[in-house]
Amino acid sequence: MWNDEDNNPYGAFDSEARLSESLHSTTIESPFNHDYPPPPSSHSSNPDISDFSQHPEASDDDEGDYVGQANRAGYSHKSVYDSRIEQLLYENPDMPILITDAGKNHEGGGSFIVYTIRTGDLEVRRRYSEFASLRQTLVSLHPTLIVPPIPEKHSMADYAAKPTKAKEDAGIIDLRKRMLAVFLNRCRRMKEIREDGVWWRFLDPNVSWSEVLHSHPASSVPKNNLKAPPLDPANPTPAHAWLPVPSASAKLKSTSGTSSSPNAEAPGPEILGRFPPESRKLSEKDLDPYFINFEASTRELELLLQGNMEKVNRRTLAHLSGLSADLMELGARYNGFSLSEQSPTVATAIERVGQAADTSYIETEELSLALGANFAEPMRESAQFASVVRSVLRYRVLKRVQEDMTRDELSKKKSLLESLERSEQEAKRIEQYLNRTSPQAPTKQRSLSTSSATSSQGGTDESRPSGEETASIDSDFPPTHAEHVSQRYPESGQTSPPAHRKTSSGTFVANKIFGRISHAVHGFVDVDPERTRRDHIGKTKESLVQLEQALGVSEKDVKDASAGVLQDLKRFQKDKEADLRRYMVAYARCHLNWARKNLETWTEAKDEVDKIEAR
């Protein structure tokens, strides 16, 4: 029914197209049939009701055969196993992972809820926070995979309603038991997660989960997974350390320009949500619109599931719960009324109607529970999946932005290096010119010194400008230079000794003050621009080498990220189609069972009413 909905990010395609669209030759596995618990009450099919109740069962059997074949095909037996739990998982691919119990743990001085996980004959107890850390670790190790979600944490409304009992709410604990089991079984079907050495250790009772988190590969992933390769984040190369990190809200550059592939066409509205064709090799720029459209459609689906669908489901379940309570009260009233009736046939008929109301109450309550477990909860999980898909697509976008940033930074460094090299060449030309003209400089200096010496012998009136000249020199040079300049004029100091003492003390204070200023100025004034320029050129060349290596790994990362995301999106596509079909079948079966049981009991009540004898 979804084939015509192009805007649906999980839109189905033709069967042949779906089977041939795998980006890499991997086995696509379908969901287990035991992901969600069966309805609380299961009744045998009645062939007289409708053919619809028979076909889903037959098709489910076929699907079960396919599931078993797919699961067995996805497992490769090993000759040596690292632990008993790994052997169980590989040798029994159809064995479910169950959460059998949830209760308080009083060991270690704390009181918290732990969940008992059973895999075959092995059991391990884990907290909710450990499940959360497992999922976060899997997301870090596999950023291109759509890692299944786990139930959400307690909301602030829960804590406000039950400040001390929020974590012990039986309904929330039962929900977590079901959904955490679904999470573990979904992870088991993903080959990359199953073989990464982290997930199965979570199920091993002989392994400390804290030690797993602080050992390779979990501890080897960089804090920012953008500085690691997409397919192997636990083993980054040195070049990944030089990659720039874009902001979380960064966007791709406009893709409205000329396409890099001459035969590629930008996808129009008619193929929104579709995967790129395999017949053409598209560049990353040509792939961008497909991912962008898929992300936008996924966001729309998330809003739909979290908005209108969630409201309708909650309202329906509340209505069924209220109806069951009314039927319970109605049955009690009819039963009480039958006791006061004098006519035996009427009393029996009324009692039978009351029993039918009681049966309807029980069946309606079971219908409410079954719809909540088999339809409402999976729909909430689908909304969480939509958020996970958007985060994976966002990772690929950030990798593309990172590549563009690296390329831009490399271009800037090249321009800077060219500018520095031009400046270096200009400085060398100026130096060569000065070297050619430098032999004439000593003659001028000697003539100047001779004329200054002649003028210094002129008299007291002519010596006064020399003193002013000395003062100007003192103010322009550091104290060491000022002392050498003052030594050239000993005559003025000999003519007036008192003035000399006063001037020398003043000069000492001035030299001390100006010396500090000169030292401070030398701290931020380039005293050796030539050496600084050469150092800058060397550092720029080193940065160029690093950025060239970073650009190389960034281009490879983008290709790997696109391939990995596309591959897992196609796997996820098939799983979602099977999940959606299972949800709809479960929804119909719940109502069929409810209607069948009510039809039987009310038919019996009608027969009793027909037996009433009129007086």
From Swiss-Prot:
Gene Ontology terms: biological process: autophagy of mitochondrion; protein transport; reticulophagy; retrograde transport, endosome to Golgi
Annotated localization: Endosome membrane; Endomembrane system
Coiled-coil blocks: none
Pfam families noted in UniProt: PX
Main location: membrane
Entry superkingdom: Eukaryota
One Gene Ontology MF term: phosphatidylinositol-3-phosphate binding
InterPro entries xrefs: AH/BAR_dom_sf (IPR027267), PX_dom (IPR001683), PX_dom_sf (IPR036871), PX_Snx41/Atg20 (IPR044106), Sorting_Nexin_Autophagy (IPR051079)
Residue ranges, compositional bias (Polar residues): 252-263, 434-446
Low complexity: compositionally biased ranges: 42-53, 447-456
Keyword field: Autophagy, Endosome, Lipid-binding, Membrane, Protein transport, Transport
Membrane association type: Peripheral membrane protein
Keyword Membrane: yes
Stretches for region Disordered: 1-71, 218-277, 432-504
Binding site for a 1,2-diacyl-sn-glycero-3-phospho-(1D-myo-inositol-3-phosphate): 127, 129, 153, 176
A single Gene Ontology CC term: endosome membrane
All copies of domain PX, residue ranges: 93-210
Family annotation (SUPFAM superfamilies): PX domain (SSF64268)
Function: May be required for cytoplasm to vacuole transport (Cvt) and pexophagy.
Family label: Belongs to the sorting nexin family.
Free-text comment on this protein's domains from its UniProt entry: The PX domain binds phosphatidylinositol 3-phosphate which is necessary for peripheral membrane localization to the perivacuolar punctate structures.
PANTHER family, A to Z: SORTING NEXIN-41
Protein name (Swiss-Prot/TrEMBL): Sorting nexin-41
